[in-house]
């Protein structure tokens, strides 16, 4: 719920999905097995706001299995070395479940973890409430520049298919921004599309742009 409210719940956009969040929460439960629910929430934000990425989050030791299947290993695999925010699945073969994360989306998520921890501290001091933690992310108030990607189709079925195709490639666009500007320009993709009731069979995606 928190991830959706704060705009960081979308694996296809380069954020995290259900499996990723479940592993992150499970790791906190391992670290603090006797903690109360409110303490677990506070520790969640504290740990991940201070986590030394790209050190991986794991629930168990990564082991080579008897079948010889490849497992996540940045020492051997060049592609694994480039992963920004490794969250490793516990079952064999252990793989990075968050390979879609980019420099831009990692930055956004760390900012959100930091905000969450600061609010949890304020809650402990009676300076904030849990409602503050779940405030919607003010996406259209934070950036000076936005990129709009518009989609038009002849009918609703074509629009649905076209939207899926475009959505799956927006992450690649973010990576190209980073690569061709040497990470001087970063992009924050909004995790969902928008529509305009006055323009049927149209849909829009937005990215907030900022310079480092």
Place the predicted regions along the sequence by residue:
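Non-catalytic helical "accessory" subdomain of NTase-fold nucleotidyltransferases
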Residues: 1-212
């Amino acid at each position: 719920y928190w991830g959706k409210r704060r705009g960081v719940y979308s694996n296809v956009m380069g954020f995290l999905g259900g499996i990723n969040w479940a592993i992150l929460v499970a790791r906190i439960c391992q670290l603090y097995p006797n903690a109360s629910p409110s303490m677990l929430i506070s520790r969640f934000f504290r740990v991940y706001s201070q986590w030394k990425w790209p050190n991986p989050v794991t629930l168990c030791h990564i082991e080579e299995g008897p079948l010889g299947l490849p497992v996540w290993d940045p020492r051997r695999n060049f592609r694994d070395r480039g992963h920004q925010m490794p969250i490793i699945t516990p079952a064999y073969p252990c793989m990075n479940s968050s390979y879609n994360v980019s420099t831009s989306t990692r930055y956004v998520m760390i900012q959100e973890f930091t905000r969450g921890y600061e609010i949890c501290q304020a809650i402990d001091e009676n300076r904030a409430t849990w409602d503050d933690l779940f405030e919607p992310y003010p996406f259209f108030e934070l950036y000076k520049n936005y990129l709009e990607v518009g989609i038009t189709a002849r009918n609703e079925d074509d629009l649905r298919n076209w939207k899926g195709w475009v959505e799956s490639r927006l992450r690649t666009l973010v990576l190209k921004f980073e690569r061709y500007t040497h990470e001087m320009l970063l992009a924050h993709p909004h995790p969902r599309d928008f529509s305009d009731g006055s323009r049927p069979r149209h849909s829009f995606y937005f990215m907030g742009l900022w310079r480092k």
